[in-house]
Amino acid sequence: MWKRVHLITLSEFFGLLASNPFLVLVMVLILGTIFVNGATDAANAIAEVVGTRSMDIDDAILMSVICNFVGLVAMTFISTAVADTISGMVDFGGDSHLAMIALAASTVGIVAWGVAAWIFGIPTSESHALIAGLTGSALAVSGGLDGVNMGEWVKVLYGLVLSTVLGYLAGWIIAKIIPIACANADRRKANNFFGRMQIAGAAGVALMHGAQDGQKFMSTAMLAIALSVGKTVGEMGGFPLWIEVLCAATMAIGTAIGGKKIIKKVGMEMVQLDKYQGFSASISATISLFIATVTGLPVSTTHTKTAAIMGAGAAKDIRSVNWGVCKEMVLTWIFTFPGCGLIGYVLAKLFLVIF
């Protein structure tokens, strides 16, 4: 784990920007990916609490904004395992200029992919887009697999299985147990109770989204800064508080501006949930994300939460799930890795010629 030593101040960062215009471009692109992540992944984290009408959509977005910020900052104190995995996943080589070009190429692809998915209201995974884009651009710069740390990539595959399988199964099991456990309870009181618990569960997912996705993209921002001064991320000493605030604020703005489209797709169109099912989905996703975060597995919040919602919905009646909407999402997930990897590779090759 990195020591929390602030070796670069905000004023020093502005000095780097003033002397390195390409760093300005790369940082703008990285903040663009964080913005898109806020509009898609962060919004998906609170979708079902709106779908069950436990919260108004504007109140849910405000809660998401606050919890994402707290999750990002708090988890940086507890564990940076996910950030370590992301920063160690690729090696752009010793030439910092080539490395910055590769990083710029990968972020352009991530933004383009994320915006396209957002236009259609499909909650794609910016986490997997980030991983694929970085890998594609690293392959382009290194000319082969030397630029990819396969040991860290294995963690991505483990995380992919965890996020979908564990999320779905946990959502299904908890949604099956609750009706049995509450069979003799007053229906109205139980409904009110699970409505309140669902809000708490959604807050937990938003916290873990900040912890997971916030670390991923914050480590990318630190990677850009490190490359601009010819260092590795580990040599930078840690995450300054100002970069945590910058990343969290950018994600929050993305959720506030673009979150409603994704919330409506997942929370209202994919499946209609009762409040206890919404709670089942939220608590399942929170547990899955926490396990992944502390073990350093870079998982997709989108995959985890959506799979949990599917499982909770199918537990009551498999026909209640709109499998047509699910198909759209799954196809987007499947194409994210090869699509963003190819875009990152092609753009890196193109940028190498131009710059």
Where does each model-flagged region fall?
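Multi-pass alpha-helical transmembrane bundle typical of ion/small-solute transporters
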Residues: 2-355
